[in-house]
Regions:
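Short coil/turn linking the two alpha-helices of tandem helical-hairpin repeats
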Residues: 159-163, 168, 206, 226-233, ...
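Conserved, well-structured interaction surfaces
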Residues: 39, 43-47, 51-57, 85-163, ...
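Flexible, polar/acidic helix-loop-strand segments at domain edges
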Residues: 87, 91-103, 321-396
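An aromatic- and glycine-enriched ligand-binding surface/loop that stacks and positions planar moieties
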Residues: 20-90, 192, 196-197, 210-357, ...
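Long, intrinsically disordered, low-complexity segments
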Residues: 18-21, 88, 115-121, 184, ...
């Protein structure tokens, strides 16, 4: 039997889960009872839950996958990255300037895209759980399946907790009532309980790109690390305890092996979004969004054998110079003359000027084409196109080490922090100072995780988010979370706007 979702129910789902363009193939019909009764069918269902991690292209997110906007949003409101307007390019209604200046409003498309991305993933998981409920599998067989799905759903809710705070908790596929806000504390408690309840039933082994115990421990560690920022409660020791439960991973000897095209063999990656252009999945666009249009000439001497690039995101002034020249991680950015592989000369831009990346920018509102140091963390090579095969890294073992180091410093035990941060810094060729303090930890986080879509959260935790920097003044405290998108509020009158933002 198939349950056909009526137009009214589908419309309800659209605003219940934040107005997302649900994939018609996935959501116009839900099998009831006749599907999900074999291992192969269950694997297909659970595999479908992970596909939403890649995001989807739509008009709201300018035809770039929505997952990219989640990471852009966390970067361009931080002290790390910016998307300056260059002539008439990258203005897009001022959404990037507003993000950098911390003057965003509830109609910002990046904010809407981040909301929709997470709730689309949640909606799909709710539908799959509903389908498994109706299957003929035994309750015991269903336990690990439910655990995996609910832990993955908790990952999306963690993102919403971090970004928006007071969001609706939607878990019942059949419930078409318009939801109300949950408090940030309620969302926090929900994420913690979902992960804690799931852990005993999750796979204890390291399984690439799947929701395992190690991934759940890592998300809980993040939750406890940011607990003070989220709910005003310090849980540093709980963060350490979760980190110590993560096993089976190690730092790769070469930092950049985590970002090569075939990075799925890394011993360091705990959780990632898998991409495969041959399979037709949306690729990792991070480098492409950053490099100049003519960067292609530095990648391949053969015409039409290089990836396209958009000349968008770049590092803010001061980020590149924060790295010592001996720091191996500094190569994650491109600075200076870009050389044409075919001619051996400096690449020229279309305006006749040399493509020489500079750290400084004239302004956020009118930057030159070559201004801003560019992202080069993920491998770029000839033969690739816009969509790439690099799996997007979400959690690395380096983060597990750095969380422990930070928490020990915050607990007043910097000597206990040293061996953890030592592993990370030594790989980069960096020596530690005599005393490990929070200022050093903050800088080390900047350098280790540059352009990995997490800097905003660090800024908030260290308090720097609210201080003036390159292109912004002092930030109001309420902007630690984003507004609920205006289109969501229009569609669901039961929702209230986050404090500080106009309705």
């Amino acid at each position: 039997m198939k349950i056909k979702i009526t137009a009214a129910i589908l419309l309800s789902m659209l605003f219940t889960v934040s107005c997302t363009d649900l994939d018609e193939q996935l959501y116009d019909q839900v099998e009831d009872g006749n599907f999900g009764n074999t291992t192969k069918e269950i694997d297909a269902l659970v595999g479908g839950a992970y596909s939403s991690l890649r995001g989807f292209s739509d008009a709201i997110s300018n035809n770039f996958p929505t997952c990219e906007y989640v990471f852009f949003l966390n970067e361009v409101v931080s002290d790390e990255a910016t998307i300056p307007t260059r002539g008439t390019n990258w203005y897009d209604g001022g959404q990037y300037q507003d993000a950098q200046k911390h003057t965003w409003k509830s109609d910002n498309r990046m904010i809407l895209s981040a909301w929709r991305y997470n709730y689309t993933g949640i909606a799909k998981i709710n539908a799959i759980i509903y389908q498994i409920d109706k299957s003929s599998l035994s309750d015991k067989s269903k336990e690990p399946i439910y655990a995996e799905l609910k832990a993955l759903r908790a990952y999306y809710y963690y993102n919403l907790l971090d970004l928006f705070g007071n969001v609706p908790i939607v878990t019942d596929f059949e419930d078409t009532a318009l939801p109300t806000n949950s408090t940030r504390k309620e969302v926090y408690d929900f994420v913690e309980k979902e992960l804690t309840d799931a852990i005993p039933h999750l796979n204890p082994n390291a399984v690439y790109s799947k929701m395992t115990r190690n991934v759940a421990y890592s998300i809980l560690a993040r939750l406890y690390l940011n607990s003070e920022a989220f709910i005003g409660q310090q849980r540093w020791q709980d963060c350490i305890n979760m980190c110590q439960k993560v096993t089976g991973y190690s730092l790769t000897p070469d930092f950049f092996s985590n970002f090569v095209t075939e990075n799925q063999t890394s011993t360091e990656i705990i959780f990632a979004i898998p991409y495969d252009s041959k399979a037709g999945t949306v690729g990792n666009y991070m480098n492409s969004m950053s490099c100049h249009y003519n960067q292609k000439l530095a990648i391949s001497a053969i015409p039409n054998n290089y990836p396209w690039s958009a000349n968008g995101m770049c590092a803010q002034p001061g980020v590149y110079s924060a790295f010592a020249d001996t720091d191996k991680r500094k190569k994650c950015m491109l600075e200076g003359d870009q050389i044409n592989l075919a001619t051996g000369t400096v690449i020229m831009m279309d305006n006749g000027e040399p493509l020489t990346y500079t750290e400084n920018l004239t302004s956020l509102e009118d930057a030159k084409e070559n201004e801003g140091v560019r992202l080069h963390k993920y491998e770029m090579k000839a033969g690739e196109q816009w969509e790439r095969d690099h799996d997007f890294v979400l959690i690395r073992y380096a983060e597990i080490l750095m969380m422990q180091a930070e928490c020990y410093v915050r607990l007043g035990s910097p000597d206990l922090a040293r061996p953890f941060v030592q592993q990370v810094a030594s790989r980069a060729g960096e020596e530690l100072p005599a005393t490990i303090d929070l200022a050093f930890i903050n800088q080390e986080l900047l350098k280790e995780f540059t352009f990995e879509g997490r800097r905003r959260t660090d800024n908030i935790r260290f308090g720097t988010f609210f201080e003036p920097w390159w292109s912004k003044g002092t930030t109001e405290k309420y902007r630690a979370i984003f507004p609920i998108p205006s289109t969501v509020l229009t569609t669901n009158k039961n929702l209230k706007q986050n404090p500080g933002y106009p309705n």
